[in-house]
Each structure stands twice: as structure tokens, then as C-alpha cells.
């Protein structure tokens, strides 16, 4: 039995209509289908939550065939790479957090891209040591790191897969050959990004223009069918042997595209061959009776853990929960404190010492929380000194890094019939990555997540500076929460660039602190407090909340909308699963009964 929540109307009349079941059709001018939380009828059931209906359908089908959560994740990502190319793909990378319901172990699979061996620390600077600008950096070969997604999924499958690896690509291959339907969101991003798509070889390669625009140079239309046979061929190769992605013709194609002018990159075949995905122990924060777990650096998940940890020691939330402006000011202050430390300390900890234990130490968080006043916001927030709580000293004095990582990302959650959970965030960095295509895939521009400068204005080294073989700092923060008995309680995560940290923390606060349902937590207004300003969704936040933030002393920017794409699953006390999917995107939830 299945229950697919809200099928957007642009699927009506199309070849996969039978996958969509809903009590009513939904359509809005913003192409953002709404959805409601779903509760399962039995604890043994599974759930899939993704940002795209076709990907959700694929994941659910794999679960019904006896696949694990990791098996489903492989099929989901193969489809998302095709139908949501603005967000993620096999030309990019990501992080997977996995909960094993037998061992109760939480592990992390790190598929973050790496910088080439011959990378230059000043590659994004001009002859005057000034930045060449984000768009020039993005639409270049300089911006592409070694893609890690295929290696990460292969490693996870070796440990947790139940079905043969090659079976998981069938849906994506069929869609690539026969055509997928261009969704409103894909069309919207082509429209928005259109002016940056290189249309002259002096600006960059013409890959994106040829794929995303029609013969008249206009964005491909909503509802039109788009084939991608190069991608189908790539998938066949990966399905046969994932290692061929890094050693064979696909690798050669990737290197050739990266090394094209203008602004050619240094990525080599040796860089491709040398790439390794990593299996790591999850980084966990104790918050009350719970364990909140996510990826260690180069992910910035430590800031998510710190936000929830700080709230243990700030003045208590009032019983009015999300309705009380004071509660939002407390959450904003926790964000500011956590972002300040993240911007200062976090980078690939294979290259830089990161005081992770100190940043999550309860005594340190208690000390930092004393900076929070119930009366008035501090004009500015400086990073703290977690090294005192790390039982070691800093190797270097580090400079502040406010580098943005732009919102071209996706997140999904899968719970299989045995209770194993995947929380996975994937990205090509900015929208359509570098705009260069190899093997039918958009190649990432993840190296723009590094600081363009090696030092700050005071001459201090920046932790997230460019170095050969290094993984750039990421905001991707897939999260799994365990209850007091070590059982799965919640999985969450989001796209959204630097705002991912705040978006993800919002759902944790909503469910764990304010006792909201998964969907209610997703629907809360997104608020991001990084630095000295607060940004909040004006159409979702009440006037009282916005005014309360101003009264507290913040400079508040009311945003027309935020680029989150939250996918959430919560296990209720009776063992049932409850899902939440972001109405700001096109995602759906599918329940799988076994």
C-alpha cells in the first residue's frame, strides 16, 4: 500500500500519472506544492521524503523491492541528478548520515569534493590580488573539485546495500532516454540564472546554453520533455562498475571539460584516480537526553549542534512556543553565537585543527550563553575560545571567513522497513554548478566554497583557505537524532547555502523544543541570524514576531522567501513515522507499507 502526498498538476496526463495519488490537485504560481505530515499505520513501514516526486517514487519502489535505505538513496540521487540538475548530481558531492537499527550506530559517509593537487591558492584573484568575482569563478574550470558522490554511494552500498548496485539506476536511465518533464522549479531557475549562462566562448563553455535553452535561446518550457542520453550512458557505466567513473572515459571527459578555456582548471586524471570517499564516526552533541548527530568537518554541522546546545543554557522558551517573539530572539542569538564560531574555526580538519570537542562542550556553551540577554541584542558577536575546553591549544591564530556557499543543493530522508535511516544532503554548490557538462552531468563549482583569500586583513591565516587535496568547508548538515535509549527519533536537513545551518536547526527547535509536528516545524518561517543582521520570511512570520525582533535591537530584513528544501522524518512515541516536506519546493512524501 502506498500514500503519495500531493502530486503537482504538471504531472497530469503524463506517463507516470499512476504514481500520483491525492485527494485534490494543487497548483500555485510559485510552483511550490503544499503537503501535510503523514503518519504510518504500522511501525514496520518505511518512508521516503525528497524534493522531487519522481525521485520519491523511485526510492519507494526500491524499498518495496526489499532494498535498504542506502539502496533507495542511490536510486533517488540518480534521478535527482537528472530532474533537478540545478541542485545536485553525480558531478558533485555530499554527506550521508546513516543510522543502523541493528547496531544503533550512526556513521557518516563523506563524499565532499577535493581540490586538485596542482591547485593555486590565488586562483580566484586577478593580477592585482583582487577577487575575479563569483560568477567568473563559478563559470570556470577553476571551480570544479573531484566529484565525490559516486564514490560515497558506492562505499555506503558496500556496507549497507541489500540489492545489487546496478539495479538502482534503471529508473534514471529510462527517464534520461525517454525524457523527463521539465518542472516549474527547473524552469524558474533557468529563467533566474539565464543572464549568467555563458553564450559566448569568451565567457565560458556553451554546455549549459545548449542543454537549458531552446533553439531561440529561451528557457526550455514547463512540461516539455527533455532527454539526456549522455547521462544515460554515464549511468550504464556507473551501474556496471562505479570505479570506472574515476578511471575511464567519464573521468577523461570531466578533465577535458575542466581544462577548457577560459579560466581553465588544473583537475587531472590522477586527481580523479586518487579520490577516496570517507567513512567516519558521526559528530554528536548531547542535548538533554538526546544525541544530535551529523557530519564532522569539512561540514559545518558542529554549528547546528552548538545552536541546540546553547539553547539549553539561555533563558527558557515560553510556553507560547513559535507564537512568542521572545522565543525567536533567543533562537536568533543562539544562531549568531554558533555562526561566529563556525566562520572562525571550521574547515577540513585533515588540514586544520578544529576545536570540535570544545565547541560542543557544555561548560563552553554555558559560558557563551551568558552573552544572551532577554532585553537587548548585542551589536556584534565575536567568536569564543573553545580551545580552553578542548584540552589543547590552537596551532594558529585564525582569521574570520564569511565566504558564502550558494544555494544549489538538495536533501532527502529515507527510512527502510528494518528501521535503518539515511539523511543525505547533496550539491553541485551554486545553481547548475560550474555550468560545464561532462557525461550529461553538470560539474560542481564547489571550490568557490573556499575562501578566495589566504589571510584576513590582520594577516591571520584563514582556516578555509585553498589547499591541494583539501575539502572545502560546507554548510551541508544532514542530521539524525537519537532518543534517550539510543533509538532513532528524527532525521532532518536542507539545502540553502550558509542558511542550511539555520534551516536545519529550525526544524530541530520546532520538533524538540516547541513540540510541533514534522510538517509544522518545516512550515515555520525560516530565520537566519549570521553576523549583525537577521533575515526572516515576511509571508510566514507574523507581524508580531518581526516587530519583536526589531524591538530586541536587530536590523531585520524581511525576505520574500527562502531557498530551503527541508525533508524531515520523526518517529512518534507509538513507533509510527511522521513526515514533513518543504512547501517551498516540489517535494512529496511517500509511505511504504510492507
Q: Locations of the language-model features?
A:
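Bacterial N-terminal signal peptides that target proteins for export
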Residues: 1-9
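C-terminal motif of bacterial Sec signal peptides marking the signal peptidase cleavage site
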Residues: 18-19
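Noncatalytic scaffold domains of N-terminal-nucleophile
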Residues: 26-57, 69-240, 245-247, 252-299, ...
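Active-site rim segments in enzyme catalytic domains, especially the processed small/beta chain
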Residues: 82-89, 93-108, 265-268, 420-485, ...
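Short, small/polar residue-rich loop motifs at catalytic or cofactor-binding pockets
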Residues: 279, 406-409, 474-476
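Internal maturation/activation junctions in enzymes
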Residues: 313-427, 560
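Extended C-terminal subregions enriched in glycine
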Residues: 469-471, 504, 513-561
Amino acid at each position: 500500500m502506498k500514500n503519495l502526498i500531493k502530486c503537482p498538476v504538471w504531472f497530469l496526463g503524463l506517463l507516470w500519472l499512476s504514481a500520483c495519488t491525492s485527494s485534490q490537485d494543487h497548483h500555485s504560481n510559485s510552483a511550490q506544492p503544499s503537503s501535510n505530515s503523514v503518519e504510518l499505520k504500522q511501525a514496520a513501514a518505511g518512508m521516503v521524503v525528497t524534493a522531487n516526486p519522481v525521485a520519491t517514487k523511485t526510492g519507494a519502489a526500491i524499498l518495496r523491492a526489499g532494498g535498504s535505505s542506502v539502496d533507495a538513496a542511490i536510486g533517488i540521487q540518480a534521478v535527482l541528478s537528472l530532474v533537478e540538475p540545478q541542485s545536485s548530481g553525480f558531478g558533485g558531492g555530499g554527506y550521508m548520515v546513516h543510522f543502523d537499527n541493528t547496531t544503533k550506530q550512526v556513521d557518516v559517509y563523506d563524499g565532499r569534493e577535493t581540490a586538485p593537487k596542482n591547485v593555486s591558492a590565488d586562483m580566484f584573484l586577478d593580477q592585482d590580488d583582487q577577487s575575479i568575482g563569483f560568477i567568473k569563478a563559478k563559470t570556470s574550470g577553476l571551480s570544479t573539485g573531484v566529484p565525490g558522490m559516486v564514490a560515497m554511494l558506492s562505499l555506503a552500498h558496500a556496507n549497507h546495500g541489500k540489492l545489487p548496485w546496478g539495479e538502482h539506476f534503471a529508473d534514471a536511465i529510462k527517464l534520461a532516454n525517454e525524457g523527463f518533464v521539465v518542472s516549474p522549479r527547473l524552469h524558474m531557475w533557468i529563467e533566474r540564472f539565464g543572464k549568467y549562462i555563458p553564450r559566448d566562448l569568451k565567457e565560458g563553455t556553451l554546455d549549459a546554453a545548449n542543454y537549458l535553452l531552446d533553439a531561440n535561446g529561451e528557457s526550455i518550457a514547463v512540461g516539455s520533455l527533455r532527454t539526456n542520453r549522455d547521462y544515460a550512458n554515464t549511468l550504464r557505466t556507473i551501474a556496471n562498475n562505479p570505479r570506472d567513473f574515476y578511471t575511464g572515459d567519464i573521468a577523461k571527459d570531466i578533465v577535458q571539460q575542466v581544462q577548457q578555456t577560459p579560466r581553465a582548471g588544473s583537475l587531472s586524471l590522477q586527481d580523479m584516480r586518487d579520490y577516496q570517499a570517507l567513512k567516519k564516526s558521526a559528530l554528536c552533541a548531547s542535548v538533554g537526553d538526546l544525541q544530535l548527530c551529523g557530519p564532522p568537518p569539512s561540514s559545518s554541522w558542529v554549528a547546528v549542534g552548538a545552536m541546540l546546545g546553547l539553547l539549553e543554557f539561555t533563558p527558557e522558551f515560553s510556553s507560547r512556543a513559535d507564537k512568542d517573539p521572545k522565543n525567536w530572539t533567543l533562537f536568533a542569538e543562539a544562531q549568531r553565537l554558533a555562526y561566529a564560531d563556525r566562520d572562525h574555526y571550521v574547515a577540513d580538519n585533515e588540514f586544520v585543527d578544529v576545536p570540535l570537542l570544545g565547541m560542543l562542550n557544555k561548560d563552553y556553551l554555558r559560558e557563551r550563553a551568558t552573552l544572551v540577554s532577554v532585553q537587548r541584542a548585542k551589536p556584534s558577536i565575536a567568536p569564543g575560545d573553545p580551545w580552553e575546553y578542548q584540552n589543547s591549544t590552537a596551532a594558529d591564530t585564525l582569521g574570520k571567513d564569511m565566504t558564502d556557499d550558494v544555494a544549489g543543493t538538495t536533501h532527502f530522508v529515507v527510512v527502510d522497513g528494518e528501521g535503518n535511516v539515511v539523511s543525505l544532503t547533496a550539491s553541485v554548490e551554486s545553481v547548475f554548478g560550474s555550468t560545464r557538462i561532462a557525461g550529461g552531468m553538470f560539474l560542481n563549482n564547489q571550490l568557490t566554497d573556499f575562501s578566495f583569500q589566504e589571510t584576513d586583513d590582520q594577516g591571520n591565516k584563514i582556516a578555509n583557505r585553498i589547499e591541494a587535496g583539501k575539502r572545502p568547508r560546507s554548510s551541508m548538515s544532514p542530521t539524525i537524532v537519537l532518543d534517550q535509549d539510543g533509538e532513532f527519533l528524527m532525521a532532518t536537513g536542507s539545502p540553502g547555502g550558509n542558511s542550511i545551518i539555520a534551516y536545519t536547526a529550525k526544524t530541530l527547535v520546532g520538533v524538540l523544543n516547541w513540540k510541533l509536528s514534522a510538517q509544522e516545524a518545516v512550515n515555520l518561517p525560516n530565520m537566519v541570524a549570521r553576523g549583525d543582521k537577521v533575515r526572516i520570511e515576511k509571508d510566514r512570520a507574523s507581524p508580531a514576531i518581526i516587530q519583536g525582533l526589531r524591538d530586541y535591537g536587530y536590523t531585520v530584513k524581511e525576505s520574500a522567501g527562502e531557498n530551503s528544501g527541508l525533508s524531515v522524518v520523526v518517529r512518534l512515541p507509538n513507533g509510527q513515522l511522521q513526515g514533513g516536506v518543504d512547501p517551498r519546493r516540489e517535494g512529496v512524501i511517500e509511505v511504504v507499507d510492507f
